[in-house]
UniProtKB/Swiss-Prot annotation:
This is Biotin-dependent acetyl-/propionyl-coenzyme A carboxylase beta5 subunit. Gene3D superfamilies: 2-enoyl-CoA Hydratase, Chain A, domain 1. Transmembrane segments: none annotated. Keywords: Lipid metabolism, Transferase. Belongs to the AccD/PCCB family.
Length: 548
């Protein structure tokens, strides 16, 4: 049934149409103006008010909030769907449910699309999909980052297989753009079905707490098929994808927080893989490193506890090495490893660091995959990698073994070995066994390896090694009735003094320098300047076979 308000609006529209003479130049301009005004609110002001009542912005307002003021240039604003099935021909709103175009963020060009959930629930139809494909291709062609603001509910069922075909074209473009231009997805509402795969193919996914959801099948379908009851937030909310699935890279407190994060993220990324990341002007230190030490540098000399089993927060190291802020990625997921962006002497760097406060810094499946993904992202976009190592090994347990720690842990090996960007490693404390190899070892292709005097580089820790190295001696002592615990402690100390230090590795060239912790920032800065002109080539190949 048509409301009185709707009838009045239609009458006014017909009246306006009657007053426009489209056979004159003035009339043609008036017609254009009318259509452009209509495209701003394709389904009316009531729909806009409902969006605002939920504390959310409209698709267009989100673009304005993210981009520089007055920089947005819209494309295909007058596009309409072509379907006539199920009476769709009677409702053909301009734009077809997605706003596309380009603009600037902090003066840098970006391409963008924003899905409009007020039009057919944000469902994807043929024209809707064509608009996204078009702006994707524009971003690839011009070498500009692509930002997708997602708020849609799957395929437009009334348009049939054509919707699925457009999904496939969008996915393929995501793949073609991968490693060529940065792709960032914001999830600003419920994204279901086919709508979730495109964000998953992009470089970064940002969600909003208590507002965003992502899932393949919703709660109703799950209950019907499995009998399991779950809410939308539990199934696919920001916390779920941040802490459990690892799909989200940041969980924002609100829409503006999400936009601020995107702006900061882009400040570390180049527009495409053929250029370098933005670099801020910073005066290079002159003179010896020890003459340029700050109070923050000196604090590193007392940061590592005397006991090798006492944890410390690796963030305390990271913040003292960087110029200013540390933009952490996936902070709530696999917290035994820390990854994110920062700057040293104005140069963007990617930080990969073990976190001793979680699982003692051990690598597990999730940490390996998180770090591997981040390393590949840095390598795609020419961002040097700095590894901070304090790793006692891979996390033991049947759960890890059964779920594929061998194959999935190898992803980090593969990512690091394949990366050709400058690679710098700092061993702060433990670097044991296979985890030593994985975390930026010299023979895995690291360019500059540094170690602190507190570094412990060995096949394994003293407590485990003594049982192997001194097995016969311990057995004989036990047979003679000696104090085994006292002997074991003495042998552990002997093992630590002999092998568990940075100097054996330094003697053999596996470590380039053993340095005071306070000198770390200075050494990294000089290494970054040296490696600016690094030339590295991989053997010709179609592509490698990552252990997926």
């Amino acid at each position: 049934m048509t409301s009185v308000t709707d009838r009045s609006a239609h009458s006014a529209e017909r009246s306006t149409e009657h007053t426009i003479d489209i056979h004159t130049t003035a009339g043609k301009l008036a017609e254009l103006h009318k259509r452009r005004e209509e495209s701003l609110h394709p389904v009316g002001e009531d729909a806009v008010e409902k969006v605002h009542a939920k504390g959310k912005l409209t698709a267009r307002e989100r673009i304005y909030a993210l981009l520089d003021e007055d920089s947005f240039v819209e494309l295909d604003a007058l596009a309409k769907h072509r379907s006539t099935n199920f009476n769709l021909g009677e409702k053909r709103p301009l734009g077809d449910g997605v706003v596309t175009g380009y603009g600037t963020i902090d003066g840098r060009d970006v391409c963008i699309f924003s899905q409009d959930a007020t039009v057919f629930g944000g469902s994807l139809g043929e024209v809707y999909g064509e608009k996204i494909v078009k702006v994707q291709e524009l971003a690839i062609k011009t070498g500009r980052p692509l930002i997708g603001i997602n708020d849609g509910a799957g395929a437009r069922i009334q348009e049939g297989v054509v919707s699925l075909g457009l999904y496939s074209r969008i996915f393929r473009n995501n793949i073609l753009a991968s490693g060529v231009i940065p792709q960032i997805s914001l999830i600003m509402g419920a994204a279901a079905g086919g709508h979730v795969y495109s964000p998953a193919l992009t470089d970064f996914v940002i969600m909003v707490d208590q507002t965003s959801q992502m899932f393949i099948t919703g709660p109703d379908v799950i209950k019907t098929v499995t009998g399991e009851e779950v809410t939308m937030e539990e199934l696919g909310g920001a916390h779920t994808h941040m802490a459990k699935s690892g799909t989200a890279h940041y969980a924002a407190s609100g829409e503006q927080d999400a936009f601020d994060y995107v702006r900061e993220l882009l400040s570390y990324l180049p527009p495409n893989n053929s250029t370098d990341a933005p670099r801020y002007q910073a005066a290079a230190p002159t003179g010896p490193i020890e003459e340029n030490l700050t109070d923050e540098d000196l604090e590193l000399d007392t940061l590592i506890p005397d006991s090798p089993n006492q944890p410390y927060d690796m963030h305390e190291v990271i913040t003292r090495l960087l110029d200013d802020e540390f933009l952490e990625i996936q902070a709530g997921y696999a917290q035994n490893i820390v990854v994110g962006f920062g700057r040293i002497d104005g140069r963007p760097v990617g930080i990969v660091a073990n976190q001793p406060t979680h699982f003692a810094g051990c690598l597990d499946i999730n940490a390996s995959e998180k770090a591997a993904r981040f390393v590949r992202t840095c390598d795609c976009f020419n961002i040097p990698i700095v590894m901070l190592v304090d790793v006692p090994g891979f996390l033991p347990g049947t759960d890890q073994e059964y779920n594929g720690i061998i194959r999935r842990g190898a992803k980090l090996l593969y990512a690091y070995g394949e990366a050709t960007v400058p690679k710098i490693t700092v061993i702060t404390r433990k670097a044991y066994g296979g985890a030593y190899c994985v975390m930026g070892s010299k023979d895995m292709g690291c360019d500059v390896n540094l170690a602190w005097p507190t570094a412990q580089i060995a096949v394994m820790g003293a407590s485990g090694a003594v049982g192997f190295v001194y097995r016969q001696q311990l057995a004989e002592a036990a047979a003679n009735g000696e104090d085994i615990d006292k002997l074991r402690l003495r042998l552990q100390q002997e093992y630590e003094d002999t092998l568990v230090n940075p100097y054996v590795a330094a003697e053999r060239g596996y470590v380039d320098a053993v340095i005071p912790p306070s000198h770390t920032r200075g050494y990294i800065g000089t290494a970054l300047r040296l490696l600016e002109r690094k030339i590295a080539q991989l053997p010709p190949k179609k592509h490698g076979n990552v252990p997926l």
